[in-house]
């Protein structure tokens, strides 16, 4: 079972995701269709910036030509918004994530590359790419890169703290719960492309120690999912009950001197 499918099933079993609820997939493709079908999702719109689409590629699901960095979606139209390994193709992955958060009615689920000390070392050694050449080459050198163009995109890698700081900046009035899932994805396909057999063998041999470190320290894994539960948001204790402003009663409790007094 893939990490994607396993995470979906976990959240469905816990009642955090509803397979029957309207669901938007951002920067989606065939893998999303296959995985969501297997997980039992029924009301899905898969969106991307692929001008080659005619509209029925993801049937029985709908398709829409949508820019993930500027979602033309009424907030709440989709109960849940899902993205799998597509934000790093955006010009601004942060903007795309915040667009998903703005528009989702209940929750956002994202799967992306994770930054870590181990990943930075692997990048320096050339085990993992800084730019994604394979995706463009695999699409006839015309698509698959930055904003689905022929320009290879940088592989943006996230941290938990980065996600939390973004949400705190965008929605400061609320405490927003975020849950994380971790996975190790070994670069077998990339290693297979190495022309020199000795270098290829050396790369394969290096996977064992990296795998051991990642298993012992899960936050050194190179892929993670994060689930943003908008329904479980809590108003900050220093906000007015209606969420409109800072509470005067909180600020004037004696711990702080009210500058407006």
Question: Locations of the language-model features?
Answer:
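Conserved alpha-helix/loop element of class I SAM-dependent methyltransferases that forms part
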Residues: 1-21, 31-35
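Short conserved loop adjoining the S-adenosyl-L-methionine
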Residues: 70-75, 91
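A conserved beta-strand element that flanks and buttresses the S-adenosyl-L-methionine
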Residues: 82
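A short glycine-rich, Lys/Arg-flanked "PGG" loop and its adjoining helix->strand segment in the class I
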Residues: 94-110
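Short alpha-helix
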Residues: 151-181
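A C-terminal cap/extension of S-adenosyl-L-methionine-dependent methyltransferases
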Residues: 176-261
């Amino acid at each position: 079972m893939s990490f994607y499918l396993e995470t979906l099933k976990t959240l469905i079993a816990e009642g955090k995701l509803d397979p029957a609820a309207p669901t938007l997939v951002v920067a989606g493709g065939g893998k999303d269709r296959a995985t969501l079908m297997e997980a039992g999702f029924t009301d899905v719109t898969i969106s991307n910036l692929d001008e080659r689409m005619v509209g029925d590629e993801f049937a029985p699901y709908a398709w829409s030509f949508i820019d993930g960095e500027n979602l033309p979606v009424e907030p709440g139209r989709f109960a849940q918004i899902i993205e799998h390994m597509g934000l790093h193709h955006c010009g601004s992955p942060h903007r795309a994530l915040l667009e998903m958060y703005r528009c989702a009615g209940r929750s956002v689920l994202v799967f992306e590359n994770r930054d870590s000390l181990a990943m930075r070392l692997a990048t320096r050694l050339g085990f993992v790419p800084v730019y994604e050449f394979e995706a463009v080459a695999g699409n006839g050198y015309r698509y698959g890169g930055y904003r689905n163009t022929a320009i290879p995109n940088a592989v943006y890698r996230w941290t938990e703290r980065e996600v939390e700081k973004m949400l705190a900046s965008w929605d400061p009035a609320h405490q927003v719960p975020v849950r994380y899932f971790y996975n190790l994805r070994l670069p077998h396909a990339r290693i297979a492309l190495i022309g020199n057999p000795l270098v290829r063998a050396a790369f394969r041999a290096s996977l064992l120690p990296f795998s051991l470190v990642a298993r012992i320290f899960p936050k050194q894994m190179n892929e993670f999912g994060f689930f943003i539960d908008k329904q479980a948001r809590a108003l900050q204790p220093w906000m007015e009950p209606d969420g409109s402003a800072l509470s005067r009663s909180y600020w004037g409790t004696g711990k702080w001197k009210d500058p407006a007094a």
